[in-house]
């Protein structure tokens, strides 16, 4: 990755061509050195240390200036300044292969021995388990007379091999533990050796060496040595489970169900004590057929109680009297039921633990998918930001190819580079599906007008001779072809210049990046949705029940809001209407009643309007003549006085058209 002190693009390209031409004139290849601080590897002593490496020029040429700590503008005649970059182990944008260090080897060995993952670790640890098991079988066979001679001789050599193997493994474990910070140094190694499993390994190795050195006579063991070997074989079986996963699982189950276990054990213990005591009282004077008293002490009664309630039933002690048999039968049914409960509790606890682990695994699959979704969503959002930090990850410098400037190339070197790159991706745990999220490199063709006049491909071919597919070009200039396939074929020939600064990004580059980010977002969203799918029928049922519960809660909330906004029927409907029709409380019935009320109000308004019109007509003129003229006019079909009518949206009523006429006497 280029820093802010990198020269502009034009100067950088001129510097690159000048280095190539300088190598041709000096008949030597100039090693490109863009770093001012680099990891100096492959030294005289083979050591790898951080040291400033100054760029070296060709013979006869002045070396270019090294980048100072405080960069200052360099004169134009002193040549281009070298670019400054960080070591690949420091920069997160570097594409170089990580260097294998001592701590890296320690870490891999430590993970292989202490944190086994993968089929290789499984094969190794399973083989060790089989060897220990075979050795234990031979130790058992040595106790049988007909196999004692063969088993003892074979066991002698197997013990020697196992002692050497476990001793070497213990030393390697102690050495590899230094990769962790808490086990660094002498005190850290002592802390690692104080672990319980490490103490057991040390005891087994030392005791086995003592037994082999002291207890053996030639190629056979002494009797005491064989007894010691048997005990060490039992301890060696603990070596199989170094992580203690079995004990942690058992401890977690017991801790989770501790209340139930304590309750059942307490009640069962009380039943054992009471049953033993009452049987002792009933059978302490009873004599069996042989004339002995079987329950002569309370200890004999406790032994009988333990054998009975644990359903073993040796039958060495049996109640003789009917009182004792009755007490024993009653307490046995009660106590056995409580002594059998811990097995069921532990079994259900293990089943729940397995189910919990399965759920945790399913949930852990969602974490990378969610992280990818968040990352792609943020990148889609950041694509609209004009800040340079948004686009900086797309302008990183690609991996350096040492084959381009090699004076004597080897045909198989490119194949080896590909194999190393594939191995690196495999070591990093990168799957083909995850490679789609890698940041691509953006390149562009150098403009024609910025190329020096003295540059030619012929001079390039005379200095650096490569395979025809890399540097031999038929055309004299770097021209982009018409098809995308030809661009891919000539990618190595055209030597596209990588974009090394954000300012070199164009609009089509940014648009392409936005499209790629949007596609990555949709892919990540689909993967996250697939990871969110339930993996068991119980989860589906639980999901449906939870959805039904949420739906009922929302319906109740909606009903509450409707009652709050419209009101409950009991607040505005009289009791008489409730008793008449139970179905009138619906929304349709309520709307019908509202329409009826509006119609009644309209009729009453019509009547009131008619009465007002009549009063106005009587006040404006003579009521007799006006009334007569109005009626006559209406009977003759002439124009009718508009004051007798309602507004234009209603028709006159029968009472308006037939106004009662009064005589002259009534008018006076």
Swiss-Prot record:
Residues 142-152, 218-225, 283-298, 320-321 are extracellular. Disruption phenotype: Mice lacking Kcnq1 show an intestinal absorption impairment which is associated with reduced serum vitamin B12 concentrations, mild macrocytic anemia, and fecal loss of sodium and potassium ions. Mice lacking Kcnq1 show microvillar secretory membranes intact, but basal acid secretion is absent and forskolin-stimulated acid output is reduced by approximately 90% in gastric mucosa. Residues 588-619 are annotated as: C-terminal assembly domain (tetramerization). Residues 587-615 are annotated as: Interaction with AKAP9. Residues 534-571 are annotated as: Interaction with KCNE1 C-terminus. Expressed in heart, kidney and salivary glands. Detected in the cochlea. Almost undetectable in brain, skeletal muscle and liver. Widely expressed in embryonic and neonatal tissues. Expressed in choroid plexus epithelium (at protein level). GO terms for biological process: adrenergic receptor signaling pathway; auditory receptor cell development; cardiac conduction; cardiac muscle cell contraction; cardiac muscle contraction; cellular response to cAMP; cellular response to epinephrine stimulus; cellular response to xenobiotic stimulus. It is a multi-pass membrane protein. A 1,2-diacyl-sn-glycero-3-phospho-(1D-myo-inositol-4,5-bisphosphate) binds at residue 243. It catalyses: K(+)(in) = K(+)(out). Residues 237-245 are annotated as: Interaction with KCNE3. Residues 299-319 dip into the membrane without crossing it. It is found in: Cell membrane; Cytoplasmic vesicle membrane; Early endosome; Membrane raft. Its main location: membrane. It comes from the Eukaryota. PIP2 molecule is essential to activate KCNQ channels by inducing the coupling of the voltage-sensing domain (VSD) and the pore-forming domain (PD). Upon channel activation, PIP2 disrupts the VSD-calmodulin/CALM interactions, causing the release of CALM from the VSD which triggers the opening of the gate. Calcium potentiates KCNQ1 channel current through calcium-bound CALM. Calcium-bound CALM competes with PIP2 to stabilize the channel open state. Residues 1-119, 176-191, 242-259, 348-668 are cytoplasmic. Tetramer. Heterotetramer with KCNE1; form the native cardiac channel I(Ks) which increases the amplitude and slows down the activation kinetics of outward potassium current and targets to the membrane raft. Interacts (via C-terminus) with CALM; forms a heterooctameric structure (with 4:4 KCNQ1:CALM stoichiometry) in a calcium-independent manner. Interacts with AKAP9; targets protein kinase A (PKA) catalytic and regulatory subunits and protein phosphatase 1 (PP1) to the KCNQ1-KCNE1 complex, allowing PKA-mediated phosphorylation and increase of delayed rectifier potassium channel activity. Belongs to the potassium channel family. KQT (TC 1.A.1.15) subfamily. Kv7.1/KCNQ1 sub-subfamily. This is Potassium voltage-gated channel subfamily KQT member 1.
